[in-house]
Regions:
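Conserved helix-turn-beta segment immediately C-terminal to the redox Cys motif
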Residues: 523-524, 541-561, 629, 633-635
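Thiol/disulfide oxidoreductase modules built on the thioredoxin-like
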Residues: 588-632
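Conserved segment of the thioredoxin-like fold in thiol-based oxidoreductases
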Residues: 549-590, 595, 599-602
Length: 637
């Protein structure tokens, strides 16, 4: 018996010794991630295996997947390929439960004791999960100091919101990403929300240097709201002509605040530090925790709420929170300048929602009743939504939209776009605002002229005369400069090659698509249904340029089909930079193609094999990796 007890004791001691060797890091801090769908709950490191405990947070009844090519990389550059999963099968769809939360483990080879941090990556494909700088030494991590430029500015509570200047000049945006690793991101999209540029939200690509710094310069006529789209979050800021805005981006704090597991942990400072143009106001805006969005619900939930409602009932629905938001802003501790801007943002949001009354009520009916394309067109164009007399009088309460200060608003350009859906918009605005003059009217007029130029239609004699009607000469200055640039580009486009304009010919609608692709039978085709006015189409066309270059020796033909909604002049000038075979079909032909192939929007892509079979179809850009994979499959059938 004593011997048995002794053996049991020895086993327990050995077990304790073995367990003592295990190194456990609970909820390790990290530098940045590409998605907050998966989080590291714990890492257990032994002599034989490294176990990463994962908690997943994703939409219920949607799936996530962990790739077999996943790996850990330590701070010395050593790679540790994944062995297997526990609770999840690699490369297999893992369906999220109703709770939207799940747990599983990922097993990797043992990690040396001298390693201080790890990167997790699924690989270098679109949508890959990546977590950079997972810290194995918490104490050392928490002792890290921020650079001296990362300062929190003192807020003057009595400060008033300055009136923006109208000057055509260069705005400078510079920044630095703290703890940057070149694997994180090599460039960032800058979304420009400015009526002085493009109501459809133009994008600039900013390259990031190896030290994590970046610089962008942009011609603007006044204060302009921009948003930087990073994989670890969006960052909004203001830029202005002849001014410099400087950002210090603290990724570890930015991600911590998004995390489910570490949201209540010790902070690492502010997510973003601002210097330069209106730094204290920008800092204050970034810290606002008041939800000023009038209706922040999933669009189908809203459609279910408003379907069948009258215009007045819709108005009451979308403005339900307006009084409480106003009250919360008034009672907040923010500066007078910040409060004024928050109220302007509310005015812009409310104006946009009221302007969209007819469109939203129709869209709700179409979506909830699941109308087909023919029924949708009939209902949308032949149904009248009654708006009672005086319905739009409420816009008088939102008169700040016709002031220069409204240019601070990140919704300003979007609101101008939404106003275009308002029946008799010019007349309604003049009646409700009591004037046909002011910054709002200037910018509405500016957009029409700017868009005409950007669509490769240089200013006419009449439009040149219209430039004199602006309240400030800066608008004419920018339009004239843009006009000169487009004329120069049109001339350059005449010399470009690499694209072919094709005629669809006189064929029946049923024979149209077979006729189009018959010319290219024997080749693998990537067919792109697109439009010149479609922002995602243009973005995707740029995104696949490296793939086109990589596959240039393959037997692949790129075929582009658009309709008459793409203005002919715009189309002719755009396709000079889109190498491939181009078709512009009639409205009737386009409608048939959309209906026959059940195409719900653009861009829509087909992959067609050499025998003429459609092997892949998707609306929305699927990503370069998926596109390439589907083309290779079609070629190798």
């Amino acid at each position: 018996m004593k011997r048995f007890v002794w053996i049991i004791g020895l086993i327990c001691c050995m077990t304790c010794i073995i367990q003592a060797k295990d190194r456990v890091i609970e909820r390790p801090p990290f530098l940045a991630w590409s998605s907050n769908s998966i989080e590291v709950d714990k890492i257990v490191m032994s002599d034989t295996v490294t176990t990463v405990y994962i908690k997943a947070f994703y939409h219920p009844k949607y799936w996530i997947k962990i790739a077999t090519g996943s790996f850990l990389k330590d701070n010395n550059g050593m790679l540790y390929p994944i062995r297997r999963g526990i609770g999840i099968t690699l490369d297999k769809e893992f369906w999220m439960p109703e709770s939207g939360e799940a747990e599983f483990q990922l097993l990797f080879p043992p990690i040396p004791e001298n390693v201080t941090s790890l990167d997790f990556s699924e690989g270098d494909f679109d949508g890959a999960y990546k977590i950079w700088g997972i810290q194995l030494d918490k104490d050392a991590f928490y002792k890290q100091k921020l650079p001296k430029e990362a300062v929190v500015h003192k807020i003057n509570k009595k400060a008033i919101l300055p009136t923006p200047k109208l000057v055509y000049g260069t705005a400078t945006l510079k920044g630095k990403i703290l703890d940057y690793q070149k694997e994180m991101i090599k460039q960032v999209k800058m979304h420009i929300e400015s009526p002085a540029l493009n109501i459809h939200n133009e994008q600039n690509i900013i390259k990031i240097k190896e030290d994590g710094t970046f610089l962008a310069e942009l011609k603007v006529v006044s204060v302009t709201s921009v948003a930087l789209e990073f994989p670890f979050g969006w960052i909004e800021c203001l830029i202005a002509p002849n001014e410099e805005t400087s950002l210090i981006i603290n990724t570890k704090e930015l991600c911590r605040r998004q995390a489910h597991l570490q949201r209540k942990d010790k902070t690492y400072g502010e997510p973003v530090y601002f210097n330069g143009y209106l730094a204290s106001l920008q800092q204050e805006l970034a810290s606002v925790d008041i939800n000023i969005v009038l209706k922040s619900v999933y669009y189908m939930d809203m459609y279910n709420d408003i379907v069948g409602k009258s215009a007045d009932e819709y108005k009451a629905y979308v403005l339900e929170r307006l009084p409480s938001i106003r009250k919360e802003i008034a009672q907040s501790q923010y500066s007078n300048a910040c409060k004024e801007l928050l109220n302007i943002l509310v005015d812009l949001d409310a104006t946009g929602k009221i302007a969209m009354t007819e469109r939203e009520l129709k869209s709700a009916h179409i979506a909830v009743n699941k109308l087909n394309r023919e029924q949708t067109d009939d209902y949308f164009y032949n149904t009248h939504i009654d708006t009672p007399k005086g319905y739009y009088d409420i816009l008088k309460e939102f008169s700040s939209i016709n002031t220069l200060k409204a240019l601070y608003g990140k919704y300003y350009a979007s609101t101008i776009y939404l106003i275009s859906f308002l029946p008799d918009s010019q007349k309604v605005l003049e009646e409700t605002l009591g004037t046909g003059q002011g910054p709002l009217f200037d910018n509405i007029k500016f957009n029409k002229l700017y868009q005409s130029i950007k669509n490769f239609s240089p200013l006419t004699t009449e439009q040149h005369a219209e430039l004199k009607t602006f309240s400030s000469p800066v608008y004419a200055e920018m339009l004239n400069q843009t006009n000169k640039e487009i004329i120069k580009k049109i001339e350059l486009n005449k010399r470009k090659t690499g694209f072919t304009v094709n005629e669809a010919g006189q064929v029946s609608n049923e024979d149209l698509f077979p006729s189009i692709i018959s010319k290219f039978r024997g080749h693998t085709l990537l067919v792109d249904f697109w439009a010149t006015w479609c922002g995602p189409c243009r973005t995707a066309n740029k995104a696949i340029l490296p793939m086109k270059e990589e596959l240039k020796d393959m037997d692949i033909i790129y075929l582009y089909i658009t309709g008459e909604t793409s203005p002919k002049g715009t189309w002719e000038n755009m396709i000079t930079d889109i190498h491939g075979e181009h078709f512009r079909v009639t409205n009737e032909q386009w409608s048939f193609l959309m209906s026959n192939f059940n195409i719900q929007g653009v861009p829509t892509y087909f992959v067609v094999d050499p025998e003429g079979n459609i092997t892949f179809k998707q609306t929305g850009f699927p990503g370069v990796d998926t596109m390439k994979e589907q083309l290779m499959k079609a070629m190798n059938k």
